[in-house]
């Protein structure tokens, strides 16, 4: 399931960090969605974390099984709709888009990790029949 609406505003990989102005690795894919629009669990699993998380702002982390996890960052204050330990299904609303943490505007920072290592969400989702690219 596509985790949010909007176009890709910042892809996975190296980029100029808008806060430090240095070349740095961006471990997720940013979707420029409207403020307060819904964020959906892209895959089913169990919520591992739900709350503030530094530069990610308000953040939800879901264990999707088989070493895979998905992260959802910059959630609006008061917009986390799940709790740690809660099972979630694909497409379930879990949060609302915001601009908390190191963010320059409303968007979802969507991160996919395999065995703890960040992977590019665009080909991963495409292989699962979901298009993130514009």
Predicted feature locations:
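Catalytic cores of peptidoglycan-degrading enzymes
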Residues: 2-134
């Amino acid at each position: 399931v596509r985790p949010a609406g909007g176009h890709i505003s910042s892809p996975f990989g190296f980029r100029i960090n808008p806060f430090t102005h240095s070349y740095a690795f961006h471990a997720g894919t940013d979707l420029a969605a409207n403020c307060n629009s819904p964020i959906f669990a892209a895959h089913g699993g169990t919520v591992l974390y739900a709350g503030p998380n530094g530069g990610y702002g308000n953040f939800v982390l879901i264990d999707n099984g088989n070493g895979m996890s998905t992260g959802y960052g910059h959630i609006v204050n008061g917009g986390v709709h799940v709790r740690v330990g809660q099972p979630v299904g694909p497409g379930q609303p879990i949060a609302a888009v915001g601009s908390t943490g190191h963010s320059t505007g409303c968007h979802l920072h969507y991160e996919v990790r395999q065995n703890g290592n960040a992977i590019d969400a665009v080909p991963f989702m495409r292989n699962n029949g979901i298009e993130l690219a514009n």
